[in-house]
Amino acid sequence: LVTKEVSYTDWESPNKTWDKVGVDVLPGYIADKKEIPAKEAATPAKDTKVIPDETDKVTYTKIGSWIPVDPTTGKDGDPIPFPNDPNDPTKTGEVTQIIPHKDGYTPKDGNGTPLEPVNPANPEEGYKPPKITDPKANIKITYDKDDQKAKVKFVSVDDEGVETPLDTKYNIDDLTGKSGDKIPEEKVQARVDVLKSMGYDVVDNPFDQDPTFDTKKEIDQEFTIKVKPQVSTAKPVYVVEGDKPSSEKLKDAVTTKGNEKTVDETKLPDTTDKVGDDTLTAPVTVTYGSGDNKREETVNVPIKVVEGYPQIVPVDPKEAPKAEDSINPDDYPAGSKFTYEKEPDTTTPGD
């Protein structure tokens, strides 16, 4: 006996047959027999009318349980005992117990078969227990990490914070793993390196925080990496009225981190009658990256049209020329000559 206790019940009969006796249901235990069957009474010994006592034994064994295993520690959790059949001490009864849900995990029986949710639309309500095949044997419930998936998209942001999605070919939609595991970053870093080669600076990268897969297998995680395009700068190019700026001067006027600069000479402006026109520009195309992974930037170089020789730089009377009034002769066409509008007084420091 499980309890190591023996109890006795009177078994009486007014005739020559012992009547059958039902076995009581003991909650939490399974009996080895449902009843004590009727049996013929033994013949009394001579010189006595007393029928000898008859003894029979019923053994109770502790009923089995479903035992959920903690997925984080691997230790057995609180057992969930099988139900007793109220009418048969040798059987288990109607199953109403529920196996608890754990976020990010799927419960499975001893054969590795996933349990059926009580409500498929809401697994958080729990799962139906595995079928009982032996009322005295425990059934372990293991929890396996769910398969998870993550996606990454890339957007370009401007100085005002406005986001523009990059070509979808740079997005990543096949990052997979298990609940709680670190999301693999190899593909993400490779994509970031490509965008850097295309002249983008990373503004915000959530993968710097080593994110992990969440516990919601029905919903893919989504991450957004923000990048900002590098911008080239240009200084003015001076040309004599009627001439066009050379490609080399235009390229030299552009400061960039790009790997190539090109000029479409068919797009160079006509400078005739354009002296003093501050809207005149010439486009220079800057290329970042190469092949299928390249970005082109159009840099509009200011074109300053000047008259023929000599060049005049006005200054205030009795002032040395100011820095902002000075010129770089290298910016002008070869052979240009320069004079002051008025001869400055170099004995008095300028402002």
Residues of each region from the PLM?
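Extracellular/surface recognition and adhesion modules
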Residues: L1, G28, W66-P68, G104, ...
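Serine/threonine-rich low-complexity intrinsically disordered regions
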Residues: L1-V6, I36, I51, V58-G64, ...
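Solvent-exposed, low-complexity, repeat-rich "mucin-like" stalks and linkers
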Residues: K4-T17, P68-P100, V157-D159, D167-R191, ...
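Extended non-catalytic domains of envelope/secretory-pathway proteins
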Residues: Y8-K34, I51, T59-T61, P86-K102, ...
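Surface-exposed or flexible loop/turn and strand-edge residues in extracellular/cell-surface modules
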Residues: W18-V21, T55, I63, G77, ...
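Serine/threonine-rich, repeat-prone extracellular segments and beta-strand-based repeat modules
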Residues: K34-V58, G110-K140, V203-E222, T256-E296, ...
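Short domain-boundary/entry signatures in modular proteins, especially
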Residues: K57-I67, I141-K151, I225-S232, N300-P310
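Short linear proline/tyrosine/threonine-rich motifs used for host-factor recruitment
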Residues: P79, E163-P165, K294-T298
